[in-house]
Amino acid sequence: MTTRKSAEAITYPIFTVRWLSIHALAVPTIFFLGSITAMQFIQR
């Protein structure tokens, strides 16, 4: 890593386009994986 003083002063916002795109894909994926695995244990 190079010693750059300018990079330390940058405050990154939390809600970025990358954050929205990751969570828009990840949150339904985790929800559907959890629901599918829960359905495997349902005895009919």
From Swiss-Prot:
Protein's cellular compartments: Plastid, Chloroplast thylakoid membrane
Cofactor note: With its partner (PsbE) binds heme. PSII binds additional chlorophylls, carotenoids and specific lipids.
Keyword Methyltransferase listed: no
Residues annotated to bind heme: H23
Keywords: Chloroplast, Electron transport, Heme, Iron, Membrane, Metal-binding, Photosynthesis, Photosystem II, Plastid, Thylakoid, Transmembrane, Transmembrane helix, Transport
A biological process term (GO) from this entry: photosynthetic electron transport chain
Superkingdom classification of source: Eukaryota
Cofactor: heme b
Transmembrane segments: 19-35
Pfam families for this protein: Cytochrom_B559
Membrane topology value: Single-pass membrane protein
GO cellular component labels: chloroplast thylakoid membrane; photosystem II reaction center
Family: Belongs to the PsbE/PsbF family.
NCBIfam families: cyt_b559_beta (TIGR01333)
Oligomer and partners: Heterodimer of an alpha subunit and a beta subunit. PSII is composed of 1 copy each of membrane proteins PsbA, PsbB, PsbC, PsbD, PsbE, PsbF, PsbH, PsbI, PsbJ, PsbK, PsbL, PsbM, PsbT, PsbX, PsbY, PsbZ, Psb30/Ycf12, at least 3 peripheral proteins of the oxygen-evolving complex and a large number of cofactors. It forms dimeric complexes.
Function: This b-type cytochrome is tightly associated with the reaction center of photosystem II (PSII). PSII is a light-driven water:plastoquinone oxidoreductase that uses light energy to abstract electrons from H(2)O, generating O(2) and a proton gradient subsequently used for ATP formation. It consists of a core antenna complex that captures photons, and an electron transfer chain that converts photonic excitation into a charge separation.
Protein name in UniProt: Cytochrome b559 subunit beta
Species in which this protein is naturally found: Tetradesmus obliquus (Green alga)
